[in-house]
Swiss-Prot record:
Keywords: Cobalamin biosynthesis, Glutamine amidotransferase. InterPro entries: Class_I_gatase-like, CobQ/CobB/MinD/ParA_Nub-bd_dom, CobQ_GATase1, CobQ_N, CobQ_synth, GATase_3, P-loop_NTPase. The gene is cobQ. The active site is at C333, H449. It comes from Lachnoclostridium phytofermentans (strain ATCC 700394 / DSM 18823 / ISDg). The keyword Zinc does not apply. It holds the Pfam family CbiA. Residues 252-457 form the GATase cobBQ-type domain. GO terms for molecular function: ABC-type vitamin B12 transporter activity; catalytic activity. Pathway: Cofactor biosynthesis; adenosylcobalamin biosynthesis. One of its GO terms (biological process) is cobalamin biosynthetic process. This is Cobyric acid synthase. Gene3D superfamilies: 3.40.50.880, P-loop containing nucleotide triphosphate hydrolases (3.40.50.300).
């Protein structure tokens, strides 16, 4: 039976995910077999496991830090927002349907057996499970049916560490208010408090720690187990997208990602963001586009609505103008579908109807009732056009999409089909599943998420852009992505280990609740 520790926060973006990532790495370094767990995650960023199930990317990152393969057991419930008041509900990696917030609130208690099955399976396989909460445990309007904070802590019988974010101010009020709003039995489960994202001299903070403990003493005896400094590490974070959207400065190689209103899987571009002389700018206005070397249309949770946004905002016309000047255009998943000629929604998956695409690729898309979920790998074959240097490069990634794309007219296979996994295509029925296609010049599209994570592919694309501009490739690119990620996990672990009382945390895990 595994020991457990749970990280809960005073609010969203308090740093729970990164602290779980850090603890997974620290415990791995200390010789333990450790797994992350989050009963319910809400995110548009998702991942497909080897066995074809969909899960949140935060737990994928945490699994990487722990040195294990991600499993849907680590995130049994994933909510992917479709509107301001509704989400697609994914349970054990498979779609259960779309629900409004009120309907899901009534339904979620029925998912407790599935949550416990996942947790208990991990419990048998690992030494330690590091559990992540969501938002705040003190959302008193939601507590009655809680399955992700104190409700989960009770189910797992897990001691809790409560994290407050000092960077946004009011950390003592955050911590005091959260503890005060909890029930007595819930307070008893909190075994330590952590202040996160601190800048400055800890000695100046220490009187406040003592005063807060004194103020809490009538209702709870909870020690501080650490003050974690504001640490700059380059690790995927679900809540970091707003910071990424602020980047507007063009560099030697400039890549513009269209900031669609319902953008999903923006982690597809993480590898491209690594290089000091490459800018990845997220733009939502024509005035922000400038003259990039590459334009990427990303994935989206609603392709049709976001295509309408593209059209109404004037970005479609701007993209077509850039294409006429031979700018490299690349679409992923929903962005790939937009680059085609027509999109049809006969089953009302995205609201019904049909809409004309940008007509830059010879495909039509029909939205189906069933979602495609799978990993994919192979070798690129006979890539045409500007990125012909990708021929022979290996690829690996995953697909998550509702649409099925077909050739819109008779096309030359060698000109448009770049992937060599022939079992994934059915030319007799004119369908395309996981193929990278081009217009034979400088427009490309794929259903494959994670394609830029492959070092050979990323290197070739940046190298091609450098060559077009007469820039020395070595000035821009010198990088091993996998090694870099490992270094970042170690850097995070070092910073957190040195600032937490790990001896006390091991004692908390040993004693339990």
């Amino acid at each position: 039976m595994a020991k457990s520790i749970m990280i809960q926060g005073t609010m969203s973006s308090a740093g729970k995910s990164l602290l779980v990532t850090a603890l997974c790495r620290i415990l791995k370094q200390d010789g333990y077999k450790v797994a992350p767990f989050k009963s319910q995650n809400m995110a548009l960023n998702s991942f497909i496991t080897e066995d074809g199930y969909e899960m949140g990317r935060a737990q994928v990152v945490q699994a990487e830090a722990a040195g294990i393969k991600p499993s849907v057991l680590m995130n049994p419930i994933l909510l992917k927002p479709t509107t301001d008041v509704g989400s697609q509900v994914i349970v054990n990696g498979e779609v259960r349907g779309n629900m409004t917030a009120s309907n899901y609130f009534k339904y979620k208690k029925e998912l407790i057996p599935e949550i416990m099955h996942s947790y208990q399976t991990l419990d048998k396989e690992y030494d330690i499970i590091v559990i992540e909460g969501a938002g705040s445990p003190a959302e008193i309007n939601l507590k009655s049916e809680d399955i992700v904070n104190m409700g989960m802590a009770r189910m797992a019988n897990a001691p809790v560490l409560l994290v407050g974010d000092i960077d946004r101010g009011g950390v003592f009020a955050q911590l005091y208010g959260t503890v005060a709003l909890l029930e007595e039995e819930e307070r008893a489960m909190i075994k330590g408090m952590i202040i996160n994202k601190f800048r400055g001299d800890v000695k100046i903070l220490e009187p406040g720690l003592t005063m807060l403990s004194d103020r809490l003493s009538p209702i709870a005896n909870i020690p501080f187990v650490g003050v974690v400094p504001y640490t700059t590490v380059d690790i995927e974070e679900e809540d970091s997208i707003s910071e990424r959207f602020l980047r507007k400065t063009a560099k030697k190689i400039d890549i513009a990602v269209i900031r669609l209103p319902r953008i999903s899987n923006y982690t597809d571009f993480h590898n491209l963001e690594r290089f000091p002389n490459v800018s990845v700018r997220y733009i939502s206005k024509v005035s922000e586009l400038l003259e990039p070397d590459m334009i990427i249309l990303p994935g989206t949770k609603n392709t049709i609505d976001d295509l309408k946004f593209l059209r109404e905002s004037g970005l479609e016309a701007a993209i077509l103008k850039a294409e006429s000047k031979d700018t490299l255009i690349f679409g992923i998943c929903g962005g790939y579908q937009m680059l085609g000629e027509w999109l049809h929604d006969p089953y009302g998956v995205e609201g019904g109807g049909e809409i004309k695409g940008l007509s830059l690729l010879p495909i039509n898309t029909v939205f189906a009732k069933e979602k495609v979920r799978k990993q994919n790998s192979g070798t690129l074959n006979k890539v045409a056009g500007m990125l012909s240097g990708l021929s022979g490069k290996t690829y690996q990634g995953y697909e998550i999409h509702m649409g099925e794309s077909t050739w819109s007219s008779k096309v030359e296979e060698e000109k448009n089909n770049c992937f060599s996994n022939k079992d994934e295509e059915n030319l007799e029925h004119n369908t395309i599943t996981s193929v990278l296609i081009s217009n034979g010049a400088h427009v490309y599209g794929t259903y494959l998420h994670g394609i830029f994570d492959e070092e050979g592919i990323c290197k070739e694309i940046i190298g091609t852009l450098c060559k077009r501009k007469g820039i020395d490739f070595e000035e821009v690119y010198e990088f091993d992505y996998k090694q870099y990620k490992e270094e970042q996990y170690d850097k995070l672990a070092d910073a957190v280990r040195s600032s937490l009382d790990m001896k006390k945390i091991y004692q908390i895990m040993e004693e339990g609740v």
